[in-house]
Regions:
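Secreted, periplasmic, or luminal enzymes acting at the cell surface/secretory milieu
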Residues: 34, 38-197
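Short beta-alpha connecting loops at secondary-structure transitions
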Residues: 3-7, 49-57, 117-120, 214-228
């Protein structure tokens, strides 16, 4: 059901035919992706009828009941992407390093798996990107001018929409040299007309010395989710982490 060179993280012919059928009959379409891995959504540009995408990872027996509440507007979504969605998966470090790489000197560690009724030997993967795994690769490559971010990334790490809007204001940063704690407040205000929750994401960009230790330009160090805020309501979130975390 796939063309040569395509993967199961792209549209199959059956899936594309289904999308063609729906978009040919409706002007406003919401696409629901029920999968655990990042999918290649480059096809969205071909379907202006698709107005929104909901990522609903496998959520067990009751997950789709919750999804129904989100689609109906009863529950305001507040989740954020836990990985980077790119426009061409074949160009990712993951795709180019993927394979079955087996050790040839660990026979004593081979174990039988009842799941596949076969023997499983220890394997490994070469991470050619080093520490720049996931979002760190794309954020750093963009900052260094190695990629065009908008041409490469479809949905960034930590991205997510809501039925309302929020404003975040960061307070002064405090540092306790004795405990090594870094702290500050972030005031989140619901500026829309629907109740909802927001997520405060804190990243740091360490100084880099040419020829020194490799460092990504974006590193998630902490995140906090607010309570459900009514329109116009605010909440001050306290952020605190150790300097060793950087």
């Amino acid at each position: 059901d796939f063309q040569k060179g395509e993967s199961f993280l792209q549209l199959s012919k059956t899936e594309r035919d289904m999308i063609d059928l729906v978009t040919n009959n409706f002007k406003k379409v919401t696409l629901i992706y029920n999968g655990a891995n990042t999918f290649q959504f480059d096809f969205l540009k071909d379907y202006p009828q698709i107005k929104s995408v909901v990522w609903c990872p496998p959520a067990g027996q009751t997950g789709f009941s919750a999804l129904g509440e989100v689609l109906a507007g009863k529950t305001n979504p507040s989740g954020k992407t836990s990985d980077t969605f790119v426009k061409d998966l074949s160009q990712t470090p993951t795709a180019n390093n993927f394979g079955s790489f087996m050790y040839d000197n660990v026979k004593e560690f081979v174990q039988h798996s009842s799941f596949g009724n076969n023997d499983v030997s220890p394997s490994f993967v070469n991470y050619s990107e080093g520490i720049y795994v996931g979002y760190k690769f794309y954020e750093t490559a963009s900052d260094e001018g190695l990629i065009d971010y908008d041409d490469t990334v479809q949905y960034p790490f930590g991205y997510g929409l809501s039925y309302t809007s929020f404003d975040q204001k960061m307070g002064d940063v405090k540092y306790d040299a004795k405990s090594g704690k870094i702290s500050f407040d972030v005031t989140v205000t619901n500026t829309g007309d629907k109740s909802g929750k927001d997520v405060v994401e804190v990243y740091y960009n360490p100084p880099y010395t040419n020829g020194g230790i490799e460092k990504a330009t974006a590193n998630l160090v902490d995140f906090k989710k607010t309570k459900e805020l009514k329109p116009g309501e605010s909440q001050t979130v306290k952020v605190e982490f150790d300097d060793d975390d950087m």
